[in-house]
């Protein structure tokens, strides 16, 4: 029986660190896209340490109007594509524009109208995760 060679542990660790860095770059590009259009109360939720999480990160914000939501969503897509060359695998909510979801598989962006954000309460649902608020300078 031929022996198979295993990759050294160090290379595997570097690969997973690189992958994590890519997820964080994606999260940061989404945040930049939100900030570009003055999204309100931006938070990111680190879901990596939770069992059965649906992504590594959620990035959440809200806007003043449906037009503002659409503008933020377009900005996110533009920033992510320009910086990383990625497009969302799936998106929802463009028709009603009360909650637009952009799914990049490892990072999911949520752009809400304020009342819908309060109603669905994603921060409450994932309260056992690490939640970070992004300071606003506008």
Put a short name on every predicted segment.
Residues 72-77:
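Short amphipathic alpha-helices in soluble, non-transmembrane regions
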Residues 60-62:
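Short hydrophobic/aromatic beta-strand micro-patches
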Residues 78-82, 130:
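A common structural junction motif
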Residues 52-56, 103-106:
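A short, glycine/Asx- and small/polar-enriched loop/turn
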Residues 1-50, 64-71, 86, 92-94, ...:
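Long, contiguous binding/interaction regions
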């Amino acid at each position: 029986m031929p022996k198979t060679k295993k990759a050294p542990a160090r290379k595997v660790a570097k690969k997973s660190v690189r992958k994590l860095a890519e997820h964080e770059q994606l999260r940061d590009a989404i945040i930049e896209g939100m900030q570009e259009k003055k999204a309100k109360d931006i938070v990111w939720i680190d879901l990596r340490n939770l069992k059965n999480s649906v992504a590594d990160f959620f990035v959440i914000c809200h806007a003043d109007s449906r037009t503002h939501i659409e503008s933020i969503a377009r900005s996110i897509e533009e920033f992510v594509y320009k910086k990383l060359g990625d497009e969302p695998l799936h998106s929802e909510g463009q028709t009603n524009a009360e909650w637009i979801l952009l799914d990049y598989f490892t990072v999911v962006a949520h752009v809400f109208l304020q009342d819908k954000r309060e109603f669905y309460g994603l921060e409450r649902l994932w309260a056992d995760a690490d939640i970070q608020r992004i300071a606003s300078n506008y």
